[in-house]
Amino acid sequence: STELTGERVLADGQKLQHSATADIDVHRPNMLRAKMVSPRAVREIFYDGKMATISIPAQKAYSTVEFTGNLGELINKLEERYGVEMPMADMFLWGTPAAPLDKIESAMNAGQDFIDNDLCDHYAFRQGNVDWQIWITTGAKPLPRKLVITNRSDEARPQSVQYFDWNLKPTFKDSIFKFTPPKGATAVELRSLDKK
């Protein structure tokens, strides 16, 4: 799960902060269930290796598209073709050949910090118009605990901050990755960004 805080910059430069949470269940290489919750919306994404479904429970609406591929490919398709953003999207690419390591302009070890009670190595990176920092637990099971992204293309330098909590021994069944429409829900077309 993750807690996310982001900033929106108004025309006069004033920053507004917003928050959301996401619970994500993953069975690699090709199953995912994500629930994103903010005060403004609840959105769910299901992927069982054959079908990807986006559900908006408050509107009793969902869209399903056929897809076979790994999670990184799914996330890229949803964003590029449909404009759907996934929380923690980059984490599905890290450690794979698709990770955009060639785009990193600079990197540094910024020392160590505690995130909750976990001692973490702190790294800072510059990549295009983005600065990002990550805190990874030290020891036998290194996992990201915090991620900060700063948008350098905006003079106000808005940031997003994510804290991660990991469960490496989940007890779910594969059936949680298959979407079953709730009673009264309506299927709607997920329109491609290139359609007018």
PLM regions and their residue ranges:
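Acidic/charged, solvent-exposed loop-and-adjacent secondary-structure segments enriched in E/D, K/R, S/T
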Residues: 54-89
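Hydrophobic transmembrane alpha-helix bundles
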Residues: 31-46, 74-75, 185-196
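Residue-level detector of flexible, active-site-proximal loop/helix-junction positions
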Residues: 4, 69-71, 151, 170
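Edge strands and adjacent loops of beta-rich recognition modules
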Residues: 97-100
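Gly/Pro-enriched, hydrophobic low-complexity segments
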Residues: 53-54, 63, 102-194
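Extended amphipathic, helix-rich lipid-handling scaffolds
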Residues: 91-93
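N-terminal mature ectodomain segment of secretory-pathway/periplasmic proteins
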Residues: 1-61
